[in-house]
Amino acid sequence: MSEALGMNGKDAPVLACRDLHKRFKEGPLDVNVLSGIDLAVAPGEQMAIVGRSGSGKSTLLHLLGGLDRPTRGEVWLAGEALSSLSERRRGWLRNRNLGFVYQFHHLLPEFTALENVAMPGLIGGLAPAQAREQAEMILEQVGLADRTRHKPGELSGGERQRVAIARALVTRPRCILADEPTGNLDSHTAERIFELLSELHQAQGTSLIMVTHDAALARRMDRTLELMDGRFVDER
């Protein structure tokens, strides 16, 4: 099936889904959140997903990231169908190929910036010294070489988000999934964070899928898809 859909080969999508559905139970009711989503993300592509609150944007991102399972349909990451994989294999594939950035940074408060950023490498099996070296390099790239020993509570909002971006990119993933990464920041800091994401995307050739309410930001992406009532209704 993956071969028929063009999931393999050097030009294959980094991330793709076919006929994706997600339904939740709310008491006696079945609530359809996503209905028949098809998507293919090319290597190095920047994509925005927009839509009103409750349209299914974050749910879609969770499914694409293998953090939740669809009610129906399939997600392919790096050519592998996620539904056929064990939890261990899914976790390994996520760690190797995906980075996650959220509106709220989700940094571990008891660890320093360096320790937070080194975590994905350690989980992926790197020796502590190598994970630390990679973390130091990416923190320098995001302009935080002098803040590596600070804990999240000692950093500004913009600095915390830069640490989160460094953590997402430290393993050089093939795709970044960003859920409102600038939504909790003032306009000046939000612009700096978007520019940083774009610069690192260009430097590493990483694909970027960003959920956002910011129409101006979305217009700067390669492609924008609009979700309404669980379906894509517009592409531009």
Curated annotation (Swiss-Prot):
Residues 15-236 form the ABC transporter domain. It is found in: Cell inner membrane. It is an enzyme of class 7 (translocase). Pfam families: ABC_tran. One of its GO terms (molecular function) is ATP binding. One of its GO terms (cellular component) is plasma membrane. The keyword Nucleotide-binding applies. Part of the ABC transporter complex LolCDE involved in the translocation of mature outer membrane-directed lipoproteins, from the inner membrane to the periplasmic chaperone, LolA. Responsible for the formation of the LolA-lipoprotein complex in an ATP-dependent manner. NCBIfam families: LolD_lipo_ex. This is Lipoprotein-releasing system ATP-binding protein LolD. The lineage of its organism: Bacteria, Pseudomonadati, Pseudomonadota, Gammaproteobacteria, Chromatiales. The gene is lolD.
